[in-house]
Amino acid sequence: AAASDNFMRF
């Protein structure tokens, strides 16, 4: 999921 990966990126 892109949203999940994006959150972990921060």
Swiss-Prot record:
Residues annotated as transmembrane: none
Superkingdom field: Eukaryota
Tissues of expression: Detected in the thoracic perisympathetic organs in larvae, and the dorsal ganglionic sheath in adults (at protein level).
Could you state one GO cellular component term attached to this entry?
Answer: extracellular region
Record's keyword terms, sorted: Amidation, Neuropeptide, Secreted
Q: Does the keyword Amino-acid biosynthesis apply?
A: no
- Give the main localization category: secreted
Give all Phenylalanine amide modified positions: 10
- Secreted recorded as keyword: yes
Where does it localize? Secreted
Q: Name one GO biological process term.
A: neuropeptide signaling pathway
**Which family does the entry's similarity section mention?**
Belongs to the FARP (FMRFamide related peptide) family.
Name the record gives this protein? FMRFamide-6
Its source organism is Lucilia cuprina (Green bottle fly)
Q: What is the lineage of its organism?
A: Eukaryota, Metazoa, Ecdysozoa, Arthropoda, Hexapoda
